């Protein structure tokens, strides 16, 4: 295996016009690449590997080209109507799409069942390194679950904030039942959204909760994800 990371550049183009832009620049070569598939195409004379993937909830491509062609590809996409965006925009989009981020919502301390990915855990393969552990976890009820959070009061559920049971007015500080792992303001749903882990018994859709936002217990609700679906 040869590592070619430093020999290549990758630019992601995402959004409702992304596929059309790439299709026009590749003379239709990209049109046969289906969602979650990889193919090759020439984009304005640049040999490229295209992955019909992304982390925004939008359709589009992640385009890999030789490193010395990265600037040319960037300029070509801009001249064709693409607009630059940074990680802040990407983070809002992936949250709206309900896509968890490793390092925030997933980690080496997370198991696939509490994160909602149990259906993808295969542990029947012979000599599987993690098979016994996954099987043991699958046979017990998890203490917590990853859920979608939607603010019904005014505030943003930022990463690290404590999630409390809904007990406004009955105690000075309601019981802590979890913690926010990702959160932002969503212009699409016009409000604060996020993800977090809560005790299993509070994980049902529709459960009312409060989130401690700088000392204020702001009302929120457990909701299904995605918050908004584009494709």
Residue ranges and their predicted role:
Residues 1-231:
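Conserved, structured C-terminal
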């Amino acid at each position: 295996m040869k590592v070619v990371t430093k020999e290549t550049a990758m630019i992601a183009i995402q959004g409702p016009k992304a596929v059309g832009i790439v299709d026009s620049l590749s003379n239709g070569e990209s049109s046969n690449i289906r969602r979650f598939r990889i193919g090759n195409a020439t984009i304005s004379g640049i040999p490229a590997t295209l992955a019909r993937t992304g982390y925004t909830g939008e359709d589009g491509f992640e385009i890999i080209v030789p490193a010395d062609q990265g600037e040319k590809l960037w300029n070509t996409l801009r001249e064709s109507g693409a607009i630059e965006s940074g990680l802040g925009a990407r983070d809002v989009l992936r949250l709206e799409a309900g896509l968890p981020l490793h390092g925030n919502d997933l980690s080496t301390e997370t198991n696939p069942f509490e994160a909602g990915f149990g259906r993808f855990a295969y542990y029947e393969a012979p000599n599987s390194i993690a098979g016994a552990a996954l099987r043991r976890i699958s046979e017990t009820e998890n203490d917590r679950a990853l859920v979608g959070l939607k603010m019904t009061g005014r505030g943003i559920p930022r990463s690290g904030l404590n999630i409390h049971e809904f007990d406004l007015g009955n105690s000075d500080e309601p019981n802590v039942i979890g913690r926010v792992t990702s959160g932002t303001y969503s212009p699409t749903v016009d409000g604060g959204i996020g993800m977090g882990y809560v005790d299993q018994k509070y994980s049902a859709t529709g459960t009312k909760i409060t989130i401690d936002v700088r000392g204020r217990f702001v009302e929120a609700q457990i909701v299904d994800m995605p918050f908004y679906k584009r494709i």
